[in-house]
Structure formats: C-alpha cells, structure tokens
Amino acid sequence: MEGLSITKLLVVGILIVLLFGTSKLRTLGADLGAALKGFKKAMRNDDEVSTSVLGETKMSAETKTVAETKAASDSQAAASVERKD
C-alpha cells in the first residue's frame, strides 16, 4: 500500500456522492457549517465572560488596595492630630 493518491481520493469522493446523493451532502454541509458557527460563537462568548470576570476581579483588588491605603492614611492623620493635642 502506497498511501492515498489523488485518484483514490477521487474514486472515494464519487462513491460518496453516488451513495448519499447531492441533496443529502448539501444538507450535511449546511448542518456542519451551522455547528461550527455555533461553536465559534460559544467560544467567543466564553472568552468575553472570562475577560469580564477577570476585569471585575482586578477592579475589586484595586478598590481594596485604594480602601486600605485610605484607611492607613486616615489612621496616620488621626495619630498626628492626637500628638498635636
């Protein structure tokens, strides 16, 4: 066995067309295309959800850091006011 040559592939293709018919193959192609389109859409939506969740996590971490910094500066300001008294 040498492998698949172009003539063998053509013979197999012709047999498939004769076996299933062009209308069945056209329907199969349309179904396959719709499935691929749905898969790509789902992957794109999954990426958008992951990005938004990652962004929210990053924003909450930044908010927490800002709140901690403000609390620390407020406590330092209160301590300096107590020292002045």
Swiss-Prot record:
Tell me, which GO biological process terms does this entry list?
protein transport by the Tat complex
Does the UniProt entry include the keyword Transmembrane? Answer: yes
Q: What does this protein do?
A: Part of the twin-arginine translocation (Tat) system that transports large folded proteins containing a characteristic twin-arginine motif in their signal peptide across membranes. TatE shares overlapping functions with TatA.
Q: Which InterPro entries match?
A: TatA/B/E, TatA/E, TatE
The encoding gene is: tatE
Q: What keywords does the record list, in alphabetical order?
A: Cell inner membrane, Cell membrane, Membrane, Protein transport, Translocation, Transmembrane, Transmembrane helix, Transport
> According to the entry, what is the taxonomic lineage of the organism?
Bacteria, Pseudomonadati, Pseudomonadota, Gammaproteobacteria, Enterobacterales
Organism of origin is Yersinia pestis
- Kindly indicate whether the keyword Protein transport belongs to this entry: yes
What GO cellular component entries does it have? TAT protein transport complex
User: One MF term from GO for this chain?
Assistant: protein transmembrane transporter activity
State the disulfide connectivity: none
User: In which broad location class does this protein mainly occur, judging by the first location in its UniProt entry?
Assistant: membrane
Would you identify the family this protein belongs to, as annotated? Answer: Belongs to the TatA/E family. TatE subfamily.
Write the protein's name: Probable Sec-independent protein translocase protein TatE
Q: Name one Pfam family in it.
A: TatA_B_E
Residue segments, region Disordered: 64-85
State the annotated membrane topology for this chain. Single-pass membrane protein
Transmembrane domains' residue ranges: 1-21
Q: Where in the cell is it found?
A: Cell inner membrane
Instruction: Name the domain of life this protein comes from.
Output: Bacteria
